[in-house]
Structure formats: C-alpha cells, structure tokens
C-alpha cells in the first residue's frame, strides 16, 4: 500500500467537514483535526510528487495572488502550490490595475474572481490593517456570490497579515515534525519560532 493511500485513510478518521469552502485566516482558528489534515494532505502531495505522480485536481482555473508587501518564499510557494494543483497563478499588481485609479475593493475583488478558485493575500505592513483588508476583500466576494455576480466564491489563503502568517507557521511546524520523526516526539521539548528561525 502506498504512503498516500495510508494518509488518505488517516484523513477519513478526522473531523474536517467545516474546512470545505472555508477561508484560512488564522492558524489558531483551526481545530487539531484540521491542522492534522493540512499536514496529512501536504505529506500526501509530497509523496505523489516524489513518485512523479500528478497532483492536479483542477483542469483549469486561477489562483489569484495579491502581495501588498515584498515576498520571496511565500510568493514562490503560492505560485508552486497553484501549479501543483493545476491552477494558473495570476498576479494582481495594484499599481497596474484600476485600483491605482480609485477602483473600490468591492469592484476589484469581484472582477478578478470570476474564474478564481483561491485567492492568496499578503498585507502585513501596518498593524490593524492587513487582516481588515483581507476580510473586506472576502466580504465583497461573499456579497458578490450571494447576489449572483459570481458563480462561485474563491477561498482565501492568508499569505501573511498583521496578525498571523499561517502558511509559514504550518510549513515550519511540518518541518519540525519531520525532523523529530513525528509530532509525538515533540512532547517535553521547548520550541521557539522567531521570524524565519526555529530554535529547539
């Protein structure tokens, strides 16, 4: 039996029904089962990739990225994730869009989301603004979907805001779990995560 099949069986034991069509704003909003599921799916994708098996679940579609701050690792990770799943990344550059001419968040959010399955937003420059902007963007999409403007509502992945950086936290934690050979081996250890450094 392949590792992916074992991981899929493990997923069946988890309570994760609320994850579907649910945005990922903050790490601490997820249940233990949901965090476990994210790590399990990441390991399954890694296993498939290492065995040169396709991981595409989309035949078409867009992953929209909006970076309101500089990024290297997260930017390329999001683009790679879109590609891995079969989505084409489309970068929303605010300086080259109608946002620069005063277009509202509501108009922009709905316009760029017509064919989008996921939207990744990084807005971490100012305390009190990043998460608020992400919520405003997604509230506009919820309204657009409810009013029939959008055929589907894309899911948000927080690529860092002023409150949390869930993708970095999750990637770092999974690395630590692999390094120690399982989450159970972290019991009794002190882990400090500071910026991009982990100390154990």
Where are these regions (language model features)?
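Positively charged, low-complexity intrinsically disordered leader regions
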Residues: 2-76
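Conserved small/polar residues in nucleotide/adenosyl-binding loops
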Residues: 198-200
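A short, basic/flexible loop-to-alpha-helix module at the beginning of a structural domain
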Residues: 51-55, 177-183
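Active-site donor-nucleotide binding/catalytic segment of nucleotide-sugar enzymes
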Residues: 194-196
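Conserved helix-loop functional segments at active or binding sites
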Residues: 44-48, 143, 178
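Short helix-loop-beta connector
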Residues: 184-188
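Phosphate/diphosphate ligand-binding glycine-rich loop within oxidoreductases
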Residues: 56-177
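Conserved hydrophobic helix-helix packing surfaces used for dimerization/oligomerization
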Residues: 63, 191-192
């Amino acid at each position: 039996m392949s590792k992916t099949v074992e991981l899929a069986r493990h997923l069946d034991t988890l309570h994760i029904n609320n994850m579907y069509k649910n945005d990922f704003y903050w790490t601490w909003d997820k249940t233990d089962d949901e965090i476990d599921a994210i790590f399990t799916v990441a390991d399954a994708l890694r296993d498939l990739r290492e065995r040169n098996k396709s991981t595409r679940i989309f035949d078409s579609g867009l992953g929209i990225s909006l970076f309101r701050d500089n990024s290297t690792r997260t930017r390329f990770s999001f683009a790679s994730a879109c590609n891995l799943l079969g989505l084409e990344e489309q970068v929303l550059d605010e300086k080259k869009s109608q946002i620069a001419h005063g277009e509202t968040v509501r108009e922009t959010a709905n316009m760029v989301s017509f064919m989008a399955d996921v939207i990744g937003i990084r807005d971490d420059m100012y305390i009190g603004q990043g998460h608020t902007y992400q919520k405003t963007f997604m509230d506009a999409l919820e309204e657009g979907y409810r009013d029939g403007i959008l055929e589907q509502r894309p899911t948000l992945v927080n690529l860092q805001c002023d409150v949390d950086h869930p993708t970095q936290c999750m990637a770092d934690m999974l690395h630590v779990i692999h390094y120690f050979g399982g989450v159970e081996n972290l019991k009794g250890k002190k882990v400090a995560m500071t910026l991009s450094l982990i100390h154990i």
